[in-house]
């Protein structure tokens, strides 16, 4: 699968996973990233997904995916069992994002975490001038019908990383699906991808 067929954050992650790596994709959906990593990088991929229909779709692609919840089921994975643990656009749906990231860093040597940036200027504009929760391309659901229970910003995420003593090995910011600079990323980036180490 080419980068063009992947969501921009997934394409960025795929380009940065080393060939032959052992990878756990948490919140893997239908396994789009897993299939790309398996086919293009020869990665040994596993997945954890809460939605049974998406688990079935991923298994139908020949992928090793189990149904489970990131908030509770990561405890069953042994320490250092993967080179990378990936959490893409799932952080904001977890009950305790800090505990989930801590589990990822226990399970994997490094963790990729991507999320929509709630502090992007369009969201701020919507709140400031419209007085309403933003609905954007990356946050498409109305406030009362969304899986998102935490709205994270780039600066908040960096603060969480700092507070827990984790290390940022890489950070990328996306706007309109394209990489953008880190200057004022909290204001101008729609999406963030971090590579962390415990």
What is each residue range found by the language model?
Residues 98-103, 110-198:
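S-adenosyl-L-methionine-dependent methyltransferase catalytic module, highlighting the catalytic core
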């Amino acid at each position: 699968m080419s980068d063009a067929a992947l969501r921009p954050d997934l394409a960025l992650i795929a380009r940065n996973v080393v060939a032959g790596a052992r990878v756990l994709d948490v919140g893997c959906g239908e396994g789009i990233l897993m299939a790309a990593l398996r086919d293009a990088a020869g990665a040994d991929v596993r997945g954890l997904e809460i939605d049974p229909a998406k688990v079935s779709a991923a298994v139908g692609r020949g992928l090793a995916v189990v149904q489970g919840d990131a908030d509770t089921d990561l405890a069953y994975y042994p320490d250092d069992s993967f080179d990378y643990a990936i959490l893409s656009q799932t952080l904001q749906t977890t009950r305790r994002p800090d505990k989930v990231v801590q589990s990822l860093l226990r399970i994997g040597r490094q963790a990729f975490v991507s999320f929509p940036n709630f502090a992007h200027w369009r969201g701020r504009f919507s709140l400031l001038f419209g007085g309403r929760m933003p609905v954007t391309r990356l946050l498409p659901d109305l406030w009362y019908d969304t899986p998102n229970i935490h709205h994270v910003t780039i600066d908040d995420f960096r603060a969480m990383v700092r507070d827990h003593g984790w290390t940022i090995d890489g950070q990328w910011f996306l706007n309109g699906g394209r990489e953008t600079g880190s200057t004022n990323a909290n204001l101008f980036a729609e999406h963030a991808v971090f590579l962390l180490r415990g």
